[in-house]
Amino acid sequence: MANKYAYNKETNEAKTARAMAKSLKISPKHCVEICNAIRGMEVTKAKNYLEDVIDMKKSVPFKRHNRQVGHRKGQEGWAAGRYPVKAAEQVLKVLENAEANAEYKGMDTENLFIEHISSHRGVVLPGVIPRAFGRMTPFNTPTTHIQIVLQEAN
C-alpha cells in the first residue's frame, strides 16, 4: 500500500521530493511547533535553524501549545519558546532524507525550499508503571508521523 501524504496539490513530480517518517517516539506538540517554524524556509536555512535548536542557541516559538511556557531571549515575533532537542533531531533526519531524495532525482539541492511539512499524532504505545499496594498507573508513549515535501525554486 502506498504512503499517503496530507499534501494534495498537483505538482510536477520532477521538481518535488518527498520524505516521511512514521511512529517516531517524540512529542507531537513539539513537532507541530517545529513544523510551523520551518514551513516555507529554504532547506539550507531550515537545516541551520534545526542545528541551532539542537545546540540550544535558538528557541522554537511555541504559538499553539504555549501554556506555562516561559519567554526566551532573542526570539523574534513571539515571546514563548522552548528548545525541543529530541524532536528537532528527528525532523532534521527526515529533512536530510528528503534532500537526499531530491539529489537522487537530479534536482538542484541548493535551490530547494520546504513546500509542505506536517506532523500528525501516531499510535499510542501503551505502558504501565507499578505503584504501591499492587496498583498500576498507565504510562503511555505518544508517537508522531512527519511528512516533508521539498520543491525546487524557479
From Swiss-Prot:
The name this protein carries in UniProt is Large ribosomal subunit protein uL22
GO BP annotation list = cytoplasmic translation
Q: Quote one Gene Ontology molecular function term.
A: structural constituent of ribosome
Assembly and oligomerization: Part of the 50S ribosomal subunit.
Q: Which UniProt keywords apply?
A: Ribonucleoprotein, Ribosomal protein, RNA-binding, rRNA-binding
Q: Name one GO cellular component term.
A: cytosolic large ribosomal subunit
Is Secreted found in the keyword set?
no
Gene name, Swiss-Prot/TrEMBL? rpl22
PANTHER family, alphabetized: 60S RIBOSOMAL PROTEIN L17
Quote the Pfam families the UniProt record gives. Answer: Ribosomal_L22
Role noted for this protein: This protein binds specifically to 23S rRNA. It makes multiple contacts with different domains of the 23S rRNA in the assembled 50S subunit and ribosome.
Q: Which family does it belong to?
A: Belongs to the universal ribosomal protein uL22 family.
InterPro entries, per database record:
Ribosomal_uL22 (IPR001063), Ribosomal_uL22_euk/arc (IPR005721), Ribosomal_uL22_sf (IPR036394)
